[in-house]
């Protein structure tokens, strides 16, 4: 499990997906700087990559190949993937722009990156998608971004999630603001995602806003 603590990334291990997770040596896998939002991606050739966010001239998404033991990155492979540069990604026109929360999936010959932009406290926090032919890019942001925002979810602060499949259906689980007037405590939501071909015969995500719903914990 890759996680963030005190703006550093670490890896913990477990024999079961439900834990407990432990670290033999409690230290970050990247020695310098500040990093958040790790996502471990294993490609079809079994190479392991760490997509993550570096706090440098804004929140920017990077990739690096992981060492075989997961306890560090191969520094020479570090490369920036993308940063906020379009209007929807910086609706508040701030100098410290934000692109974060990367999730990577491969469909056919293309890599898809779901990412979020704007500060998470901004009602316009939203999800965009970029594609690449190679895991190191270049990454091209799709026309139609953002694909998930308060405009089709009905909730402010919709973003920073993960993609998973149940049966034949894909879903995206993400944060939202507590309400359209309060940011915290943030809530968790789920929304079905379909992939449809656009005019260029490229698969693009289609979020079903009518089925967007908040997840609630059961009392036990």
How should each PLM-predicted stretch be described?
Residues 1-220:
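Carbohydrate-active catalytic/glycan-binding domains of CAZyme proteins
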């Amino acid at each position: 499990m890759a996680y963030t603590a005190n703006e550093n990334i670490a890896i913990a291990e477990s024999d079961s997906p439900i834990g407990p997770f432990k670290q033999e040596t409690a230290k970050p896998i990247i020695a310098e700087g500040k990093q958040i939002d790790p996502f471990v991606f294993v490609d079809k050739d079994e190479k392991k990559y760490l997509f993550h966010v570096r706090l440098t001239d804004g929140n920017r998404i990077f990739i690096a190949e992981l060492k075989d033991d997961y306890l560090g990155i191969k520094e020479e492979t570090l490369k920036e993937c993308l940063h906020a540069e379009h209007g929807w990604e910086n609706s508040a026109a701030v100098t410290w722009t934000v692109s974060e929360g990367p999730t990577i999936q491969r469909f056919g010959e293309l890599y898809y990156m779901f990412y979020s932009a704007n500060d998470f406290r901004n009602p316009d926090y939203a999800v965009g998608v970029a594609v690449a032919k190679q895991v190191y890019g270049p990454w091209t942001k799709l026309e139609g971004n953002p694909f998930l925002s308060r405009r089709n979810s009905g909730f402010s602060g919709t973003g920073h999630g993960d993609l998973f499949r149940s049966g034949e259906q894909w879903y995206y689980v993400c944060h939202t603001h507590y309400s359209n007037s309060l940011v915290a405590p943030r809530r968790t939501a789920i929304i079905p995602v379909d992939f449809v071909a656009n005019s260029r015969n490229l698969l693009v995500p289609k979020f079903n806003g009518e089925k967007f719903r908040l997840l609630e914990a059961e009392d036990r």
